[in-house]
Amino acid sequence: KDKKVPVPIKVKDKPVPIIDINDDALLDQDITLAIKAFEDFGKAILIIWNKLDLLPKNSDPLKIIKEKTAKYKHFFDIVPQILFSARTKRNKEKLIPEIKALWARYSQRIDSKEVYLYIKELLSQKSLFKIQQKLQIQSLHVIKTSPPTFVIRSRQYALFGSSEVNFLTNHLRKQFDFKGVPIIWKINND
């Protein structure tokens, strides 16, 4: 008999992780791979929680997922998730529409001027300061989709740290429906 040899999965090739809701041993590994694909390789992510049929009868799958993924809350708040059972086909009808919706969000075209005006308005309401300097943006351009990539030109480009970028990312994600989509920023001098 031929033995099946596991084929290593390249992180960048796994944009739709299927995670066994009952397998705690692989849970951290699967989530780590999903986060790496999202953050390091710019892959859109949809999490599919499989094997719902194996949960105890009166259990709450959402509560179980929330407990098991508490330390990854920041990630699970921004990616779509589907509860699924391959055996019973529960929620099978939701898979293709959700994958298509994710692809539409990932590849959507956004006008640079629209994004710039949105960010400018946002910063007029909530200014960003670093080392007692008000951070200002001279220009913003969308340079690509899949994943959406933005270039900001600012005289204080060196002061833009992770908290400032996260602030912009979180607001942009909500405004333009980038759920499950990584957002790439390039910040340069004026």
Predicted regions and their residues:
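C-terminal-of-GTPase-core extension/linker across diverse P-loop GTPases
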Residues: 1-14, 22-24, 28, 32-190
